[in-house]
Amino acid sequence: MSDDDNLAKKLTPSAKTRRRRSSTRPEPLSRRWIVRLVMLLIAFLITVTLGVLAWGVSEFNARGPSTEPVTVVLEKGAGVNAIARQLETAGVIRRADVFAIATRISKTAKKLKAGEYQIPAAVSARAVMHILIRGETVVRKLTIAEGLQTAQALELIMAAEGLQGDLDAGGGLSLAEGRLLPETWHYKWGDSRRDILRRMQEGHAQMMEKEWAARAPDLPFQTKDEAVVLASIVEKETGKADERAHVAGVFVNRLRLGMRLQSDPTVAFGLSPDAPLDRLLSRTDLRTDHAWNTYMRKGLPPSPIALPGRASIQAVLHPLTTKDLYFVADGTGGHVFAQTLAGHNRNVAKWRRLQRALTTGGD
């Protein structure tokens, strides 16, 4: 091999050298741009995500759109999406999607409680969420007045908004007269009518146990049921608190002496046990014999004639000590009492003169 050939061989790179040099050649321009674009896209997505999160948090904490309290009823079994849409439709929150997503992220979606809520004005979606988690539902009131008949009380229970179900007897419940405690009862939307009826019945039983245990000695009746019967008569005879014990004392005296009670409300109940009698009693009514006519029959009638309140129960268990045997209306909402029939007749005559004067306008 000539010197020229050796020189050419030295100056010509080998295949191995060419491969090594080609492997260190700079990457094509297009690949670098792809990497940069991907990195820019990731940065953009992160920025957008953070922006959306910041907006969502701001929206979740912002004041609500309502300008006054809003009442909403959330049904049992409703999912978070349905609840969120209902709140948005009612004007409680601005966006249902923000509320639904926030409750899911905070893992409180399944903690939202059904019921009736009164959401304050302009509260944030976050505040609404916590109200629903705590179950701060509306507490309703149902007032059963003393002196109502059981049928009237049942009508009020059936008409009470938010209560559910029927009022069939059974399961320990009684629809008998005088077995319910007339008070103001609290309940929440969705409570059953049977439950509130049971509470009234249990309240009456507990009250009677307590009051009966503290009763005065030597009363002319032997059972709690008899006490309720007499208390119901007192309840219907007078609405004045300071008269109850006095009226009870008169009836206790008459029972001890074997006299007829001669109570108009008992006669009226016998004529119309399912609703108040819608007319005045006549002389014929007083002479019509039935189990509740205490003008015709001695002793207590067979059942209460109304729902007696606690005060009337206490009055018959602690009657006023008196010699009075009679009373009649005095024209002012109260009564005038007498020990003798002669005195009573004079009081009745005064009452009738007053009635005539009122009827004729004083002429």
Where are these regions (language model features)?
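Signal peptide-directed extracytoplasmic domains
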Residues: 55-211
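Short N-terminal micro-motifs specific to bacterial/archaeal maturation
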Residues: 28-31, 71-74, 90, 119, ...
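Bacterial extracytoplasmic/cell-wall-associated proteins, especially those involved in peptidoglycan
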Residues: 79, 155-164, 171-363
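N-terminal type II signal-anchor transmembrane helix
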Residues: 21-69
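Short low-complexity stretches enriched in small and charged residues
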Residues: 26-29, 37-44, 69, 74, ...
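N-terminal Lys/Arg-rich, disordered targeting/topogenic segments
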Residues: 1-32
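Short, flexible segments with low predicted structural confidence
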Residues: 54-56, 125-126, 284-285, 315-316
